[in-house]
Amino acid sequence: MTEGTATIRTRKFMTNRLLARKQMVCDVLHPGKPTVSKTEIREKLAKMYKVTPDVVFVFGFKTNFGGGKSTGFALIYDTLDLAKKFEPKHRLARHGLYEKKRPTRKQRKERKNRMKKVRGTKKSKVGAAAKK
């Protein structure tokens, strides 16, 4: 999308000192154009607030019926470390900042079969031992 086709307005701005971030509702006006991508919204917000795009997290965008206006939520963290600390893992994964470590198929099967051999509360001990 070319520059200047979408207008971003922020409202309900709040500085959350406890979580070291700025949070706001974003209104994106894009008359006659398709929905604006989240990466473009991130870049424009980063430029507006003079921060790098990697500390800007946008989510929850809904486009109004008939198009032309989308509304969502934006969070701008003070640092990337604080963002990694407070943001949910799925949002970090969308930015490429988190990779879930999944055990191999064989390890999962072995754990499942070990769990079958015990009953009740002992399962948690067997499962915990299998993780380490």
UniProtKB/Swiss-Prot annotation:
Membrane-spanning residues: none
InterPro entries: eRP_eS24_sf (IPR053709), Ribosomal_eS24 (IPR001976), Ribosomal_eS24_CS (IPR018098), Ribosomal_uL23/eL15/eS24_sf (IPR012678)
Keywords carried by this UniProt record: Ribonucleoprotein, Ribosomal protein
UniProt-annotated stretches for the region Disordered: 92-132
Cellular component terms per the entry's GO annotation: ribonucleoprotein complex; ribosome
Cysteine disulfide links: none
UniProt biased composition (Basic and acidic residues): 92-101
Keyword ATP-binding: no
Biased composition (Basic residues): 102-132
GO molecular function: structural constituent of ribosome
One GO biological process term: translation
PROSITE patterns: RIBOSOMAL_S24E
Family designation: Belongs to the eukaryotic ribosomal protein eS24 family.
Name this protein carries in UniProt: Small ribosomal subunit protein eS24
Organism in which the protein naturally occurs: Spodoptera frugiperda
Gene: RpS24
